[in-house]
Amino acid sequence: MVAITSLAQSLEHLKRKDYSCLELVETLIARCEAAKSLNALLATDWDGLRRSAKKIDRHGNAGVGLCGIPLCFKANIATGVFPTSAATPALINHLPKIPSRVAERLFSAGALPGASGNMHELSFGITSNNYATGAVRNPWNPDLIPGGSSGGVAAAVASRLMLGGIGTDTGASVRLPAALCGVVGFRPTLGRYPGDRIIPVSPTRDTPGIIAQCVADVVILDRIISGTPERIPPVPLKGLRIGLPTTYFYDDLDADVALAAETTIRLLANKGVTFVEANIPHLDELNKGASFPVALYEFPHALKQYLDDFVKTVSFSDVIKGIRSPDVANIANAQIDGHQISKAEYELARHSFRPRLQATYRNYFKLNRLDAILFPTAPLVARPIGQDSSVIHNGTMLDTFKIYVRNVDPSSNAGLPGLSIPVCLTPDRLPVGMEIDGLADSDQRLLAIGGALEEAIGFRYFAGLPN
């Protein structure tokens, strides 16, 4: 068995032949088998993975590009190896032969299909408590949620079952589970990554995203997926101007999250970061106008189109009838039973509220001369499995989905890049993540800033395997 480190470090070990690709793969397989209770993985092909590793070792190219690195793919992304099911019964045997472009680009660079990650059914939730495939468990505490909807990928990366993973993010689904599991989650600018052959929620908002152990690993994967091979120059902390929009993003935080944010800001300020306290005008109003109307209207249309294109034997009705998770069924059935968003509401959201939200971000960054904004990824840490509809937060019963996505939703609706970085553990040893957002197409600059912040913060923990 070999010591499992980051993706970047593993590539260096493979290049130096400190261990073989097969030795790495056997170690990861053993870890996956030891961590079955997390229910992070939906599908695997260990024999196929071993054959691929042996082939790489014979050719002697391990560590070149991504050669020899097994990755976890969320179960709504076509890999050509594992079923593309979105973890819902009607699609459980749907296995497209052609992979998505995001998977194909990684495979072309030498990455291996390591596993398919369990997820919130049809990506429509943030707990990954899936009544069809079972709840994914948080590797820091198996009684708690890992976040979602890419919860299986986050749990697999956090417990080092896989060296990295690809999820999808409509409004939170990469960054939130990364934060709750203590790893890094990156949502790129909308359109930076190809989104074909992925079971959709909302084409206006959906994008593949990266979950990894550190920012350096995200940079490696981003470079390959986006096709931007140039290196990102390091960014010094001194001189960075980072916005703190305290109203909205810092409202009603869990006490542990508030302390983590305060401590992180103080640490970074002492290292030379200039923080600008300024609120984003009309953010709540614009975000509410752009958020749910777009996602709820587009979901049935987008899913029907996907089924027409790729799964001719399964109808939209088959999928909806087969849904097992009550929270997802309630949302889906509402779109069928006459409570759906009207075309007029959708057009207003997409062509009025959304452009105004985007313009508001641009003006905010320009007026305050900002490099990024910083805020807690989620207002609260991971909570017990089963609180899918409501959760008590600071003494008040709140909608689980809305409180968890509150901070990450606005930039999703604006199509902006966001990077969640773990900053500390609470006294209960639960991770807290903080997110930096940038303007559209500032992805590489944002990753460079994230790398500098990560180094300064110095989070050095990982979850380990369940007992």
Swiss-Prot record:
Pathway participation: Plant hormone metabolism; auxin biosynthesis
GO annotation terms (biological process): auxin biosynthetic process
Entry keywords, A to Z: Auxin biosynthesis, Crown gall tumor, Hydrolase, Plasmid
Signal peptide: none
SUPFAM superfamilies listed in its UniProt record: Amidase signature (AS) enzymes
Coiled-coil region: none
Keyword Hydrolase: yes
Molecular function per GO: hydrolase activity
Enzyme Commission number(s) of this protein: 3.5.1.-
Domain of life per record: Bacteria
Hydrolase found in the keyword field: yes
Active site annotation, chain numbering: K74 (charge relay system), S149 (charge relay system), S173 (acyl-ester intermediate)
Pfam families listed in its UniProt record: Amidase
Family: Belongs to the amidase family.
Functional summary from the UniProt entry: Hydrolyzes indole-3-acetamide (IAM) into indole-3-acetic acid (IAA).
Protein name: Indoleacetamide hydrolase
